Design a protein with these regions (language model features):
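Covalent nucleotidyltransferase
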Residues: 33
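Short loop-to-beta-strand entry elements in the cores of soluble alpha/beta enzymes
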Residues: 40-51
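Glycine/small-residue-rich phosphate/adenosyl-binding loop
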Residues: 49-139
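A short secondary-structure junction signal
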Residues: 141-145
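Short hydrophobic alpha-helices that are characteristic scaffold elements of the AMP-binding
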Residues: 155-159
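Residue-level detector of anion-binding/catalytic polar loops
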Residues: 163
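Conserved small/polar residues in nucleotide/adenosyl-binding loops
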Residues: 169-170
Length: 170
């Protein structure tokens, strides 16, 4: 698969099979992704791969915690600006309508929307999860580096015939 096909066929998948991702595929992807650009080549990302029983346990604990309604630690930043401007607000709204509509969930069905949201913490059934972090003392330029790294990882996964989804929090 060439890079154009990888880019245009990449989708944010929210439903995975339980078929394991071979270790050699993950190693190949992460080895190549290490070539991602970063300012002054500091490569600020740290990647942890979790699969198998440890991932199953982590997902189970996360889903149980979310289901209790007990909040996680306070967020260090807002996911979206409180007063998001046009056209971004409309795009986000359209995505929500499309997603919940495809799941047959009405806007006013808060319980069903919450159940659908909990699937985030199960990683939508993915058999592998990559947790990627940067040092919290780094700044916006390193967040951009991280974004380039994540895009590279997702395109390399696509080139391997796999789909992926980036989650901001779990």
């Amino acid at each position: 698969m060439d890079v154009y096909e990888a880019v245009t066929s990449r989708r944010a998948v929210r439903g995975f099979t339980d078929q394991p991702v071979p270790r050699e595929v993950l190693e190949r992807v992460l080895t190549a992704a290490a070539w991602s650009p970063s300012g002054s080549n500091i490569q600020p990302w740290n990647t942890y791969v979790v699969t198998g029983a440890p991932l199953a346990e982590l997902k189970k604990l996360a889903v149980e915690r979310v289901a209790t309604g007990v909040p996680w630690d306070e967020r260090e930043y807002e996911m979206y600006p409180p007063a998001m401007k046009s056209p971004y607000r409309e795009r986000r709204s359209a995505f929500g309508k499309e997603r919940y509509g495809a799941l047959g969930i009405a806007r006013e069905d808060w319980e069903a929307r919450q159940r659908a949201a909990i699937a985030n913490w199960d990683c939508f059934g993915a058999p592998a999860a990559l947790f990627v972090y940067i040092d919290r003392d780094l700044g916006p330029a390193q967040w951009a580096d991280l974004g380039m790294y994540l895009q590279t990882v997702m395109l390399l996964l696509r080139a391997e015939g796999l789909h992926s989804l980036s989650l901001i929090h779990i």
